[in-house]
Amino acid sequence: MSVFDLFRGFFGFPGPRSHRDPFFGGMTRDDDDDDDDDDEAEEDRGAWGRESYAFDGSQPPEEFGFSFSPRGGMRFHGNFGFDDLVRDFNSIFSEMGAWTLPSHSPELPGPESETPGERLREGQTLRDSMLKYPDSHQPRIFEGVLESHAKPESPKPAPDWGSQGPFHRLDDTWPVSPHSRAKEDKDLDSQVSQEGLGPLLQPQPKSYFKSISVTKITKPDGTVEERRTVVDSEGRRETTVTHQEAHDSSRSDPDSQRSSALDDPFSILDLLLGRWFRSR
C-alpha cells in the first residue's frame, strides 16, 4: 500500500489508483499496477460516474468529487462543505464592489453653476473681465458690489521674526534694514524725493587686490628684456619694460657669463681640451 492509498483511506476517498482520479491519478500510476487497473475498471466507472453523473451530479453523499454542469460551472460533491465555501466567497466578491466604488458617479459642473455677476456682460471684452479696476474699462461686480466701491483691505503687517531666525546671531555683523523685511509694493519715486538714495542703496563691501606678472626674455645677442605688468582691483594696468645689455650683465653677474658660455658647444670643448693644448 502506498502513501496515497493510506491518505485516501483515511479521508474516505473511494476508488484506489484510478486513471480517472483527478487528484492522484497521474502520481500513483506505476508499471506494477497495470494489471490491477484492468480488473478495477468497472468499479472505477461506478465510483466516479460516467456520462449520467457528469451533468446531473447524482453521486452518493459519502463520495467526494466534482462534476461540470451544462451551464458551464463546476460543482463539488462530498461532506467537506465546498458548496458552502464557494457560495460564501461569491457573496464576499459580489459585495466587494460596494466597499471600493463610490455610490454615484462624479458629475461635471454645468453652466448653471456660474453666478450672473461672473458672466460677460454685453459689450464687455475678455480683457475687461479678467483685469481689475481701474486697469479695465469697466469694473466688475462681486456679489452685488462694484469693484471700485469695495473697501480695500488693510495689508497685514509682515511678521517680524526677530531672533527666531536661524542666523539671528549674525545680525550684528550684517544688520538687516527694516525696508528689506516688508514685502509690499512701494512708490520709490516719492521715497527718493523725500529721503534720498541713502536708505535705498545699501553699502556694498569692496575688495582690493593687485596682480603682478614679470616676464624675462633673453635674446641671441645676450640682451635681456624684462616686462613687469601690474593690475589693480579697479582694472588699471601698468607695464614697465626694462632692457639690459650683454656687457652690463657680464660685469655685474659673473655666473650669467659662465652659463652663457656653456650654451656654446665650442666653449665647452675649449674648457675641456684647452688645458692639454696650452700646456704642450
From Swiss-Prot:
Region of interest (Involved in HCLS1 binding), ranges: 115-280
Region (Involved in PLN binding): 204-226
Tissue specificity remark: Ubiquitous, with highest levels in kidney and liver (at protein level).
Ranges of biased composition (kind: Basic and acidic residues): 116-125, 134-154, 218-256
Phenotype upon loss of function: Mice lacking Hax1 fail to survive longer than 14 weeks, due to a loss of motor coordination and activity, leading to failure to eat and drink. They display extensive apoptosis of neurons in the striatum and cerebellum, and a loss of lymphocytes in spleen, bone marrow and thymus.
Modified residues (N-acetylserine): 2
Ranges for region Disordered: 12-70, 100-263
Positions of the UniProt region annotated as Involved in PKD2 binding: 185-280
Gene Ontology biological-process entries: cell surface receptor signaling pathway; granulocyte colony-stimulating factor signaling pathway; negative regulation of apoptotic process; positive regulation of granulocyte differentiation; positive regulation of phosphatidylinositol 3-kinase/protein kinase B signal transduction; positive regulation of transcription by RNA polymerase II; regulation of actin filament polymerization
One MF term in the entry's GO annotations: protein domain specific binding
Subcellular location per the Swiss-Prot or TrEMBL entry: Mitochondrion matrix; Endoplasmic reticulum; Nucleus membrane; Cytoplasmic vesicle
Start and end residues of each stretch annotated as Involved in CASP9 binding: 176-207
UniProt-annotated stretches for the region Required for ITGB6 binding: 271-280
Site residues by UniProt (Cleavage): 128-129
Region (Involved in GNA13 binding): 177-248
UniProt-annotated stretches for the region Involved in ATP2A2 binding: 204-246
Cross-referenced InterPro entries: HAX-1
Keyword terms, alphabetized: Acetylation, Cell membrane, Cytoplasm, Cytoplasmic vesicle, Endoplasmic reticulum, Membrane, Mitochondrion, Nucleus, Phosphoprotein, Sarcoplasmic reticulum
GO cellular component: actin cytoskeleton; apical plasma membrane; cell cortex; clathrin-coated vesicle; cytoplasm; endoplasmic reticulum; lamellipodium; mitochondrial intermembrane space
Membrane topology: Peripheral membrane protein
Chain segments carrying region Mediates interaction with UCP3: 211-280
PANTHER family hit by this protein: HCLS1-ASSOCIATED PROTEIN X-1
Task performed by this protein: Recruits the Arp2/3 complex to the cell cortex and regulates reorganization of the cortical actin cytoskeleton via its interaction with KCNC3 and the Arp2/3 complex. Slows down the rate of inactivation of KCNC3 channels. Promotes GNA13-mediated cell migration. Involved in the clathrin-mediated endocytosis pathway. May be involved in internalization of ABC transporters such as ABCB11. May inhibit CASP9 and CASP3. Promotes cell survival. May regulate intracellular calcium pools.
The family this protein is said to belong to: Belongs to the HAX1 family.
Assembly information from the UniProt record: Interacts with ABCB1, ABCB4 and ABCB11. Directly associates with HCLS1/HS1, through binding to its N-terminal region. Interacts with CTTN. Interacts with PKD2. Interacts with GNA13. Interacts with CASP9. Interacts with ITGB6. Interacts with PLN and ATP2A2; these interactions are inhibited by calcium. Interacts with GRB7. Interacts (via C-terminus) with XIAP/BIRC4 (via BIR 2 domain and BIR 3 domain) and this interaction blocks ubiquitination of XIAP/BIRC4. Interacts with TPC2. Interacts with KCNC3. Interacts with XPO1. Interacts with RNF217.
The protein, known as: HCLS1-associated protein X-1
